[in-house]
UniProtKB/Swiss-Prot annotation:
Keyword Nucleotide-binding: no
Record text on subunit structure and interactions: Heterodimer of an alpha and a beta chain.
Cysteine disulfide partners in this protein: none
Database matches in CDD domains: IHF_A
Entry-linked SUPFAM superfamilies: IHF-like DNA-binding proteins
PROSITE patterns documented for this protein: HISTONE_LIKE
GO MF term set: DNA binding; structural constituent of chromatin
Gene: ihfA
Domain of life: Bacteria
Protein name, per record: Integration host factor subunit alpha
GO cellular component: cytosol
Amino acid sequence: MGGKTVTRADLAEAVYRKVGLSRTESAALVEMILDEVCDAIVNGETVKLSSFATFQVRDKNERIGRNPKTGEEVPILPRRVMTFKASNVLKQRILQEHQKRQGKTSK
């Protein structure tokens, strides 16, 4: 299933090719967008990108975990975690692409 990892530079290059901004402007635009998303998430805001996904910060309570080597109970401190929930549109696109690839390999 391996695929390429898309980097900030790849996103900037795509903006450059599709929008027609200079490479410098494209890179700056990508940075600005990512900075805005990061700032919102850090501030505890939910970021919803329609037809893509929702990013949300969630508080997790303290709980008891277990050291897998010793079996000893260990407290896991409360913390904040970020969640990513793909939209139904994105899930459908992933499923369709998977089915399309399966069809090619099975023939």
